[in-house]
């Protein structure tokens, strides 16, 4: 327990509420929506979009195409040139941006139609059990792969080893607090 003496309130679990109960209440209150799409919890941020749904509550099902907010619309390959400065993405296809944020958004716009970076992550939840969540992260995956290629060409095997050890350790502590 992280904060002894604090009561944890879990109404969804305690009241055994189901998604259908939520939908029924919203309909009764006059809220109209595409309930097929509402089956999924979608959270978008700078580094990607997480997608949760009934399929992620199992250990063997993948998410269907329609669960992802960015549909696969492109199939003809394109080449993209990335420019880094001190490890940060600053340019895409020869255009240098004022901020890395703008460069990331530009790369995301190019990569998103290819449905790059889709997967299901399995990890430890805050309550100590394993959990699964789908995600799409086109620009981050390309940036990571770009960094990995640069590292292969510039670091020794022992530098790579220790960099990976430190990255895993740092990532866990950053995530876990």
Model-predicted regions and their roles:
Residues 1-177:
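Nucleotide-activated chemistry modules centered on ATP-dependent adenylation/adenylyltransferase
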């Amino acid at each position: 327990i992280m904060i002894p003496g604090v009561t944890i309130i879990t109404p969804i679990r305690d009241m055994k509420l189901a998604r259908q109960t939520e939908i029924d209440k919203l309909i009764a209150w006059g809220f109209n929506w595409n309930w097929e799409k509402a089956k999924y919890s979608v959270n978008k941020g700078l580094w990607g979009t997480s997608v949760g749904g009934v399929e992620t509550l199992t250990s063997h099902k993948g998410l269907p195409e329609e669960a992802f907010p960015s549909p696969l619309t492109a199939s003809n390959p394109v080449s993209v040139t990335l420019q880094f400065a001190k490890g940060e993405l600053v340019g895409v296809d020869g255009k240098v941006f004022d901020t890395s944020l703008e460069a990331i958004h530009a790369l995301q716009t190019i990569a998103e139609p290819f449905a790059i970076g889709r997967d299901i992550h399995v990890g430890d939840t805050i309550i100590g059990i394993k959990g699964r969540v789908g995600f799409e992260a086109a620009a981050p995956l390309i940036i990571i792969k770009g960094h990995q290629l640069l590292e292969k060409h510039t670091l020794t095997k022992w530098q790579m080893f220790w960099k990976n050890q430190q990255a895993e350790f740092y990532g866990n502590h950053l995530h876990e607090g």
